[in-house]
Regions:
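Short, acidic, Ser/Thr-enriched surface-loop or helix-capping motifs
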Residues: 16, 21, 80, 122, ...
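Conserved active-site neighborhood of the chymotrypsin/trypsin-like protease fold
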Residues: 1-72, 157, 222, 228-229, ...
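Short, conserved beta-turn/loop elements at beta-strand boundaries and strand-helix junctions
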Residues: 7-8, 29-33, 87-94, 182-185
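Short peripheral tails and domain-boundary helices/loops at the edges of structured domains
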Residues: 84-98, 245-257
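C-terminal recognition in membrane/secretory proteostasis and scaffolding
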Residues: 3, 25, 52, 57, ...
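Active-site loop architecture of trypsin-fold serine endopeptidases
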Residues: 9-10, 45, 65-82, 91-117, ...
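Small-residue-enriched segments and motifs
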Residues: 12, 22-24, 83, 118, ...
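Flexible glycine-/small-residue-rich
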Residues: 16-18, 28-30, 40-42, 66, ...
Length: 260
């Protein structure tokens, strides 16, 4: 489910189709990805198959399931709405709340308050996303206007694996680099034909940076196509894209008069 669904809850209960209610335990929760992993005591629960969000097609049919406006309590069944995938890879970056929404699935399936944390499934009934938020067009509007967003299931699987293992998501990292801004004085001294980017001062032995072939004197211009002009810019790219240890990044560098 979503982190914002269970945030600040004193007690969490899960009601299955048919009305059976169970108390849930929080295995782990992560505000950055807005995901939480819950556990029910028992066995032989019905469950949905998790699909893949790797090769989704715009125009593909999808179904959003959930509990909009607490309607589940009337019939003890989830509500369903049908639509298509309107867009993929929708990036919102880091919000003021601290959440980072990357590669979101946009759908015109009706998603309303109460749908958060519910599944977005494909025509085969496989879960391809976690319904998370809607765009209403104004602060006063409350209902769906056909623009909803879901966290891709592949991203959710990755977070859930960490939550199951440790109860949290580890975002500690080390680049193995010491850098400084390329100022006009540095560019003149080193004969660099510009005064932008950051220059590598030191590369830690055995680090991923060393393994990738980076060297002192290289000038990093972009990280994942985003300009970097001061040391903190590298950290900002990592945080804004929710990158973690083991993730790969693409750099544009200047070395010995050539761009690489």
């Amino acid at each position: 489910t979503n982190h914002h669904v269970i945030e600040n809850a004193d007690k969490i209960s899960v009601t299955l189709s048919g009305g059976s209610e169970y108390e849930a335990e929080i295995v782990g929760s992560d505000i950055t990805s807005d995901l939480a992993l819950l556990k029910l005591d028992g066995s032989d629960f019905p469950y949905a198959q998790l699909g893949s969000s790797e090769d989704l097609l715009i125009g593909e049919w999808v179904i959003a399931l959930g509990n909009p406006f607490q309607l589940f309590s009337i019939s003890n069944k989830p509500s369903a709405s049908v639509g298509i995938i309107s867009a993929t890879n929708m990036d919102f970056g880091r919000l003021k709340s601290g959440k980072v929404f990357q590669d979101m699935i946009q759908t015109d399936s009706a998603i309303n308050h109460g749908n958060s944390g519910g599944p977005l499934v494909n025509a085969l009934g496989e879960v391809i996303g976690i319904n998370t938020f809607i765009y209403t067009g104004s602060d006063q509007a409350q209902g769906s206007v056909g623009i909803g967003f879901a966290i891709p299931i592949n991203s959710a699987k990755r977070v859930a694996k960490e939550l199951r293992t440790t109860g949290h998501v580890d975002r500690g990292y080390s680049t193995g680099l010491v850098v400084q801004s390329v100022t006009q004085s540095i560019s003149r001294y080193l004969n660099i034909p510009f005064s932008k980017g950051v220059i590598i001062v030191e590369v830690t032995d055995g680090s991923a940076a060393e393994g990738s072939g980076l060297e002192p004197g290289d000038v990093i211009l972009t990280v994942n196509r985003e300009p970097v002009n001061k040391p903190s810019d590298i950290r900002s790219v990592i945080i804004d894209n929710d990158l973690r240890s083991g993730d790969k990044v693409t750099l544009k560098i200047f070395r010995d008069g050539n761009y690489k």
